[in-house]
Amino acid sequence: MYTVIKTIKISASHYLDLKYKSKCCNLHGHNYIIKVFCRSESLNEDGMVCDCSKIKNAIVEAFDHKELNKLIPQPTMENIAKYVFDLSGDKCFKVEITETENNKAVYEK
């Protein structure tokens, strides 16, 4: 089994619509670190699990320097991870989103 991990850094803003008071309800930004994990039993004709540049381009185009609320209705780390997972193709089995040094979320199948 082959596994590749693509790490992508983006800057984006968002706010959360929470049922309680929180500073996260105000528009603010993060320097996200996104890790996309892909695997396959075999390599494609180019000798790769997948083309990591296509994954990076899709994520950067969707997220970098954007307001995430315009893309994802409630852009929590968890919802962002699922959205990235859905963008990343059939070889993707896990996505890890780092919002801050102390806050990470993982979505995996």
Report each predicted region and the residues it spans.
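Charge-rich, low-complexity N-terminal segments
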Residues: M1-K109
